[in-house]
Curated annotation (Swiss-Prot):
Gene (name only): nuoI
Binding site for [4Fe-4S] cluster 1: 63, 66, 69, 112
Protein name: NADH-quinone oxidoreductase subunit I
A GO cellular-component term linked to this record: plasma membrane
Residue sites binding [4Fe-4S] cluster 2 per the record: 73, 102, 105, 108
Amino acid sequence: MRNITNFLKTFLLWELLKGLKVTGKHFFTRKVTVQYPDEKTPISNRFRGLHALRRYENGEERCIACKLCEVVCPALAITINSTEREDGTRRTSSYEMDLFKCIFCGYCEESCPVDSIVETNILEYHFEERGENIMTKAKLLAIGDKYEAQIAADRLQDKDFR
């Protein structure tokens, strides 16, 4: 009897029919695919996208050249050179970040004592020429200046979790 049952299951392609049943069940349900360039899903305010350097309200850059972000970066993507100013404080003379090395872990953002380096919600960017993947201090400050309102709003909304 067992041999007959196994023969019928094999002959009728029982496993194939079970698979087709699952396919038929889901065939008429609502699709979950998002047509990406035309439709976009909401992005969390904790999203870790392109980096930016922030400034204080008076226009002075926040980075104090403590180099904590450079030390904590597991991918060694950040390089900082600093100079001392006349008043005895340090500031960065160059701040470079290689986005091909960066793994967007967020350690640089967490380690920064003055909230200078942040990761923005920007996820759509590309490079057309060699070397554009190296984000300089000027590029990072420009991104920070452009998106400061959004960065500040995201930080305010997320302050209880920091």
